[in-house]
């Protein structure tokens, strides 16, 4: 395997307008490269030349246009050319109206800035390795959710097969949520233990029926939350048809993972008595006016128990 590219956010990102114009010039060069490759292909295959419309389907600019247009809902790249006065025009529309390059937002510019270097080194060779650091930088959270599939599509051929392996390092919950929902992606958490970095795989599927931001924050960033706690509690109820909190409390209490000296915490509501730390915290969250409090350690302990039950 060949390392195709090691790409850090320090390489191309703190850009001024002049720097962005240089990226646009490189985009123009990619179109010129496509034209040269088309001519060269037909010289080599003069017995069976391709029409431009056929060759364009596997060109770099077609790859750029398809990925860019799929990423932005209200924006489109439609080509480049020259005006009657020989002024270079890069074709972008937003909400159906043509705009100039300077009207692009910082996030829109960044997508172009990140894409151009990748297209420059893209070849027909397969099974390369691509490294991208912080692909979500400067992007709106909605775009952070989409950037994972954007880079995958960039290296997917016309038959829908991804041709290169991509490694992306991210601290974005929105990005990681999409990655964890993709069965073809492997999410690995890096943990620093006294100066030694260890890798921990985040398994598919997770504990919930659908990946949530609260679960991403816990599994990847080790952030405990009341939201994730009660999502796990509801998951146990739904999985085992336990509509009443008391029924769920009894189920947890009699589960083989329940350890009395760790997980028992008696509480009550009216005549109903609950015996588990999970129900105690669940009720403290849902009925915050009941005066019940809990520590972060108790919250973590309860989450870990419910994960074991759902494993």
Would you name each region that the model predicts?
Residues 36-46, 169, 203-206, 223-228:
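Low-complexity, flexible helical/coil segments
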Residues 1-7:
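Phosphate-binding active sites in nucleotide-utilizing proteins
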Residues 1, 86-211:
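Switch/communication elements of ASCE P-loop NTPase nucleotide-binding domains
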Residues 153-161, 174-311:
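RecA-like P-loop NTPase motor core
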Residues 64-68, 147, 212:
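Generic structural signal for hydrophobic residues
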Residues 9-129, 159, 269-272, 276-281, ...:
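Extended helical coiled-coil dimerization/tether regions that scaffold
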């Amino acid at each position: 395997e060949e390392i195709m590219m090691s790409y850090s956010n320090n390489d191309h990102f703190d850009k001024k307008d002049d720097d962005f114009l240089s990226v646009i010039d490189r985009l123009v060069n990619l179109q010129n490269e496509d034209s040269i490759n088309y001519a060269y292909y037909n010289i080599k295959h003069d017995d069976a030349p391709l029409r431009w419309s056929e060759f364009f389907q596997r060109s770099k600019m077609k790859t750029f246009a398809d990925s860019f247009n799929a990423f932005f809902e209200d924006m489109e790249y439609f080509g480049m050319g020259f005006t009657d006065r020989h002024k270079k025009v890069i074709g972008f529309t937003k909400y159906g109206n043509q705009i100039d390059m300077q009207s692009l937002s910082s996030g829109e510019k960044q997508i172009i800035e990140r894409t151009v270097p990748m297209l420059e080194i893209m070849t027909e060779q397969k099974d390369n390795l691509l490294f991208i650091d912080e692909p979500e930088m400067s992007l709106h959270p909605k775009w952070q959710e989409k950037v994972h599939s954007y880079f995958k599509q960039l290296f997917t051929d016309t038959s829908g097969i991804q041709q290169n392996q991509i490694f992306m390092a991210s601290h974005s919950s929105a990005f990681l949520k999409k990655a964890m929902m993709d069965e073809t992606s492997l999410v690995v958490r890096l943990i620093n233990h006294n100066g030694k970095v260890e890798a921990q795989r985040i398994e598919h599927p997770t504990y919930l029926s659908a990946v949530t931001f609260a679960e991403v924050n816990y599994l990847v960033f080790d952030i405990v939350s009341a939201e994730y706690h009660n999502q796990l509690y509801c998951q146990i109820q739904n999985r085992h048809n336990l509509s009443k909190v008391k029924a769920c409390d009894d189920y947890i209490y009699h589960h083989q993972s329940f350890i009395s000296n760790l997980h028992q915490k008696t509480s009550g509501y009216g005549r109903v008595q609950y015996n588990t730390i999970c129900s105690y915290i669940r009720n403290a969250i849902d009925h915050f006016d009941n005066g019940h409090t809990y520590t972060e350690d108790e919250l973590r302990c309860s989450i870990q128990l419910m994960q074991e039950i759902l494993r």
